[in-house]
Amino acid sequence: MYEVRFHGRGGQGSVMASGMLAAAMVEEGKYAVSIPSFGFERRGAPVVSFLRMSDREIRQLTNIYQPDCIVCVDPTLTKSVDIFAGMKAGGTLVQATHHPLSELALPDCVSTVGLLDAVKIALEIFKRPITNTLMLGAFAKTTGVVSLESLKRALEDSEFRDAGLAQNMTALERGYAEVAVHHIERRAAA
């Protein structure tokens, strides 16, 4: 089983991204379940969403406390939320940020990092900092667990139409093309 935890802010579409990723996994013949976490959060408040994917039926519908991968769609969130809490050793981070890898403080559990200046690109495409579809493209390239084509089909099957569909398709493709993927070698303690 592969578990993903999405971190974002209300209104950025992290819950929608989790659902779209689940649809793409089903498109590939896998089992997937998206688990949104709703409370009384308002637009701009930190939110979290969860996704499990597997080759077998998934019966566990709880929150994810030890993710294999963390997708953070908001570059400011790491200042106020411990997004790395419980992350498994050898984990993957897909982060929206304009900072290079050398400027990020990453815990030892992270071994693969996908960095994307998603806010800049979102402002070019949408004229708003909505980064969710960009980060799905970045997730696909960074992890390799889902194909870009399956994400495109899931996007086509979503509620987006006309200009919104075209913009989100562009965002998905640019996220995939422009993410910088880094593999971090960690030395074992002596």
Curated annotation (Swiss-Prot):
Q: What is its EC number?
A: 1.2.1.58
Catalytic activity annotation: phenylglyoxylate + NAD(+) + CoA = benzoyl-CoA + CO2 + NADH
Tell me which domain of life the UniProt entry assigns to the organism this sequence originates from: Bacteria
Keyword set includes Ribonucleoprotein? no
Q: Recount the UniProt induction comment for this entry.
A: Induced anaerobically by phenylalanine, phenylacetate or phenylglyoxylate.
Q: Which GO biological-process labels does this protein carry?
A: L-phenylalanine metabolic process
Report the pH profile. Optimum pH is 8 when measured with benzyl viologen. Half-maximal activities are obtained at pH 9 and pH 6.8.
Report if keyword NAD is assigned.
yes
InterPro entries registered for this protein in UniProt: Oxidoreductase_gamma_subunit, PadE, PorC_KorC, Pyrv/ketoisovalerate_OxRed_cat, Pyrv_flavodox_OxRed_cen
Give the UniProt keywords, A-Z: NAD, Oxidoreductase
What are the protein's GO molecular function terms?
NAD binding; oxidoreductase activity, acting on the aldehyde or oxo group of donors, iron-sulfur protein as acceptor; phenylglyoxylate dehydrogenase (acylating) activity
Tell me what controls its activity: Activated by magnesium ions and thiamine diphosphate.
Q: What does this protein do?
A: Involved in the anaerobic metabolism of phenylalanine and phenylacetate. Catalyzes the oxidative decarboxylation of phenylglyoxylate to benzoyl-CoA and CO(2). It can also react slowly with 2-oxo-3-methylbutanoate and use different electron acceptors such as benzyl viologen, methyl viologen, FAD or FMN, but NAD seems to be the physiological electron acceptor. Also catalyzes an isotope exchange between CO(2) and the carboxyl group which proves partial or complete reversibility of the oxidative decarboxylation reaction.
How it assembles, according to the record, is: Dimer of heteropentamers composed of an alpha (PadG), a beta (PadI), a gamma (PadE), a delta (PadF) and an epsilon (PadH) subunit.
Name this polypeptide is given: NADH-dependent phenylglyoxylate dehydrogenase subunit gamma
Gene name of the record: padE
